[in-house]
Amino acid sequence: MKRLLLWAALPLLLLSCTEKIHDPGKDNKGPVEGELIAINGFYTLEHEGFKFKIREEEYNTAAAQSAIALLKENFEEINSLLPKSALDVMHKNPIWMERNLTDGAAWYHTSKEWLESQGYMTEKWHCVELCNFVHYVSWTKQNQPYMVLHELCHLYHDLALPGGFENPDVKAAYNHAMAAGLYVNTPYRLDKDTVIQHYDDYYHAKVYATTNQMEYFSEICEAYWGENDYYPFNYEDLKAYDPQGFALMEKVWGKRDK
């Protein structure tokens, strides 16, 4: 599991946790952007076409403000990288922010039934969620700078590609990579200064891209557009190491300006 980054397409892979809607109370409102009004305990904000929601009682905390500032930076970079057609899809559904709903950092919710069965808010269906925005900040700064992009690519894969998560082009590239053993014991970036050469041996675990075609897709999207913590780390690595995955990226997103 990618540093406990959790993805909600396969319910059995997710942590079980009961969602509770907190009473927003009256003591921690303070100044907010514009004339924001909390609905069902959440403020809805917008930046660069992206909408995001955060609990009223969390908004003015230092941790939340740090997460919001970083999220806005992520939005700006994503808007500068991706084609408008993809951004139009990604801008539609809000990103939800929770302080510590789980001990992961971010996930994408593809199943309304699973959300309901776990006691989570079904309004989060087809949305990306920062399920622990404290971890989101620290892990993004440590070695996962494109965490939000990764989750948004799950959303795009699910909602925009023909066949959704069963898209045949994605499955073909994934199956080829798995058959070729491309994502076995590859290097991993622990932080900006440290790369371990053999992930499987170091962690006694499998490289995250091997999980399924959904994680493979979002992992190579990180490499194509920016930087991944797992090898291939970037555009040039992906092009040289996994040509079929690279061709998939160009087919899905179009050729990228280097």
Report the location of each language-model feature.
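Positively charged n-region of N-terminal signal peptides that target proteins for export
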Residues: 1-4
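Metalloprotease/metallohydrolase-associated module, dominated by Zn2+-dependent proteases
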Residues: 122, 172-258
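Sec-dependent N-terminal signal peptides
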Residues: 6-10
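Acidic/histidine-rich, surface-exposed loop or edge segments in extracytoplasmic proteins
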Residues: 44-65
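N-terminal low-complexity, Pro/Thr/Ser-rich intrinsically disordered segments
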Residues: 23-46
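Acidic/His-rich structured neighborhood in mature extracellular/periplasmic domains
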Residues: 55, 63-179, 246
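C-terminal motif of bacterial Sec signal peptides marking the signal peptidase cleavage site
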Residues: 15-16
